Each structure stands twice: as C-alpha cells, then as structure tokens.
Regions:
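Cationic, histidine-enriched alpha-helical/coil surfaces that engage anionic ligands
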Residues: 1-331
C-alpha cells in the first residue's frame, strides 16, 4: 500500500467511496433484521459520509446521471426518522425515567407505547426504501463504477499538492454562519439555524476526516473539536425534539402534567447551551479560521516534502541497484 504522501487525489477518493459502499452493503441485512438499533445508526452514518465524499471530490469523478445522490438522500431521510425515534426512546428509558416519580412514569406509558408504534412504522418505511429497485440499482451501478472508475485529469495529481483545496468549500461558509454568535436561545428560528449549523459542522468534520492520512496534530485536533460541537448541538436538538413530541402526546401541558420531567429537560438544555457557548466563543473567530487554514497549509507542505524525499530515495535506490548490476555483470 502506498504511503499517504504518495497518494493521488483519485487514490484517496476511490478508497473512501469503496469503503463506504462496502459498509452500506454490510449493514443492509442487520438493519432489515432490526435486532439492535446500532446497525441502523451506522448505516445512516455511512450514507452521510458517502454523500459528503461524492460532493467533496466531485471534481475528480466522472459519474453518470443515475449515480446522483438522490437515492442516498431519500434513504437517509427514511433511516433518520427511525433513528430519531430510537434516540428519543433510549433517552426516556435510560436517562429520564429512572429519575422520575412513579406518577410521572405511569403518565408516560401511553407516550412510550405511541413512540414504539411510530418507530415500528418508521422502520417499515426504511426497509421498504432499502429494498427499492432505485436504491439497490444505485448500489449496483456504483459497484460497477468502482471496478472501472472514470476520473478527470485532476484525479491523477498528487493529493499532497491539493490538500487545502479539498476543505476550502466548507471553510468559506462555516465560520460566518450567524448561529455561532447567538447569545441566547429563544426563538424557533434560532433553533432552526443552530440545527443548520450542526449539519455544516458535521460536513466539515467528515471532509477533514476524509483527508486524515495527511493531517497533522493541529488539524486532527480540529476534527475532535468539531465532533464535540456536533454532539452538543445534537444533544440540544434531541432535547427540543423530545419536548415537542411530549407536548403533542400529552393531554395537557408538559410543565403541568410532568413537572419533574420538564425540569430535567430544561436543566439538560441549559447545560448543553452553556457548554456550546463556551466552545462557540473560542471557535467563531477569524483567528480560529486562520489557524485551521494555516494548519492545512502546513500539512500540505509537510506531505509534499515527504513525497519529494521518498521519490529521491526511490531514484537513488534504482541508480545504486543499476550500478551494482553493472559491477556484477560478467565481462
């Protein structure tokens, strides 16, 4: 296997796509069997990563129209609905119910039954999508493409020369998103913008992670920070979704029917928000942007020097080998 510094743009892109397509195929049967919620989660992650990879490295790939991301988007939405319900149920059962008085637990039983019914229906829709000819045909076409990839000339250029460019598309918009600078969380519009920012952070993390073989310590630290921010905003969103779901299911208001649960949800939301604000204040600045851009440029330079030294070593090795052959050749 080639050293990362020797990879071309196409080497990296094809390797990522192949791994993610293989992951989708491997998770298909466990998701359909539905014996554990984890395969569904992992398949959804693989779908997202594949979509990000196809967009990120789109300039390298010659893909026919049938290989557009549309089937992936629809499949991801179906899996996402089931996954969201898994998360809601797990949060209620594992984290919240043990802290509630018996009266509130009893009042929640109809809500829990309704969530189970909705999750069963959502999983059925997800399975229906996974069995559709459009999705299975897309997978088959992508596997055929991987056997004989069609690439643009840019794919054959060294990855080390292009490392920052594969991040610039998201870097140009991520740090100027307005949701970084929200001081308080009051309006529904703000919640929607935070959810949109979370998606951008997730995309940034996946795109950085795609180039991880060539990344140094500072760039890898950025991946860890993005993951932490994504998880905090995800936690915040989950708590808000759960509150809305409970409001829809309960006969009265959440605050009056389930005061203990309502207090726990508000406490969790405030805790997430304070942690998020601390991180956001340290990251939403031109300095953080410049530091990450500088780290990527440094990674690019280091990878180029590594590639050049390896090429020089290989040339010297061949020259020495040829000289020895001449010395040992019978006269």
């Amino acid at each position: 296997m080639s050293h990362p510094a020797q990879l071309t743009n196409g080497d990296l892109a094809i390797g990522l796509i192949a791994r993610q397509v293989r992951s989708l195929v491997d998770w298909q049967a466990p998701v359909l069997a539905d014996k554990d919620p984890e395969p569904l989660h992992q398949m959804r992650v693989s779908l997202r990563k594949l979509r990000v990879t196809l967009v990120q490295f789109g300039p390298l790939l010659r893909l026919s129209e049938p290989l557009s991301c549309r089937p992936l988007i629809k499949t991801g939405r179906r899996l996402g609905l089931a996954r969201d319900l898994d998360v809601l149920q797990a949060r209620l059962h594992d984290q919240l119910l043990p802290q509630l008085p018996v009266a509130e637990v009893e009042l929640l039983q109809p809500v829990l039954r309704q969530l189970r019914r909705e999750r069963h229906q959502a999983h059925g829709l997800a399975c229906e999508q996974l069995r559709r000819a459009s999705y299975l045909g897309w997978l088959a076409q992508m596997q055929r493409w991987l056997r004989h990839p069609r690439l643009t000339p840019l794919a054959h250029e060294p990855l080390a020369d292009w490392l920052p460019q594969w991040q610039l598309v998201w870097l140009s918009t991520l740090f100027v998103h307005p949701a970084w600078r929200f001081e308080q969380l009051r309006k529904e519009r703000q919640r929607e913008q935070l959810h949109a920012l979370r998606k951008q952070i997730k995309m940034a993390r996946y795109q950085l992670d795609n180039c991880k073989p060539l990344l140094g310590r500072r760039s890898r630290q950025a991946i860890a920070v993005f993951k932490q921010m994504q998880e905090l905003l995800g936690e915040l969103n989950d708590l808000q979704v759960l509150q809305r779901a409970l409001d829809d299911q309960l006969p009265g208001a959440l605050a009056s029917d389930l005061p203990q649960l309502h207090g726990l949800l508000l406490q969790g939301e405030d805790h997430c928000w304070q942690q998020w604000r601390t991180l956001a204040q340290s990251q939403a600045s031109s300095q953080a942007y410049q530091q990450l851009l500088g780290a990527l440029q440094h990674d690019r330079l280091r990878a180029r020097l590594r590639r050049q030294s390896m090429n020089l070593y290989s040339s010297l090795h061949r020259a020495v080998f040829c000289d020895w052959r001449m010395v040992l050749q019978p006269r």
